[in-house]
């Protein structure tokens, strides 16, 4: 089951709204049985992304947590987990990026960039398209 929601926090205010963010994550954690949580990498330099990472780590203690790669924000990145993608997966990802209306003019939001990163990660593991993640917490590894 995939779930998502949009919360209307103002940009660059999550650190001052940290407790509310944690409370919302805690409520989600209590009302759902998540197998895996995706969040910004622990190496992400953006202040809001750091807050999300910290509060996800606190709230979802019993879930696998993977940090996603955002090269324009990451100081460095550990490519611990590699997941093969299809072209349909990549097209769906590009479509989802359209939800970030305020970011659409940024170079890293274009389809070519998404494809280039997927191809680069694929080269590392002998696949056509791959997304890599930082293993923040792994529960019951395969």
Residues covered by each model-derived region:
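Active-site beta-strand->loop->alpha-helix modules in alpha/beta enzyme cores, enriched
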Residues: 1-64, 120-121, 125-128
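Histidine/lysine/aspartate-rich catalytic loop segments that bind and position anionic ligands
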Residues: 62-72
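The feature marks non-catalytic terminal segments
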Residues: 1-2, 31-32, 36, 70-142
């Amino acid at each position: 089951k995939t779930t998502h929601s949009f919360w209307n926090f103002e940009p660059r205010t999550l650190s001052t709204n940290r407790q509310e963010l944690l409370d919302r994550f805690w409520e989600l954690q209590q009302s759902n049985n998540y197998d895996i949580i995706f969040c910004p990498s622990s190496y992400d330099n953006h202040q809001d992304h750091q807050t999300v990472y910290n509060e996800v780590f606190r709230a979802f203690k019993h879930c696998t947590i993977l940090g996603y790669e955002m090269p324009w924000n990451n100081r460095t990145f550990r490519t611990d987990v590699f997941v093969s993608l299809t072209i349909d997966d990549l097209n769906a990802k590009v479509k989802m990026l359209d939800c970030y209306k305020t970011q659409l003019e940024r170079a890293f939001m274009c389809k070519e960039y998404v494809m280039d990163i997927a191809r680069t990660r694929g080269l590392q593991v002998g696949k056509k398209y791959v997304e890599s993640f930082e293993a923040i917490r792994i529960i019951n590894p395969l």
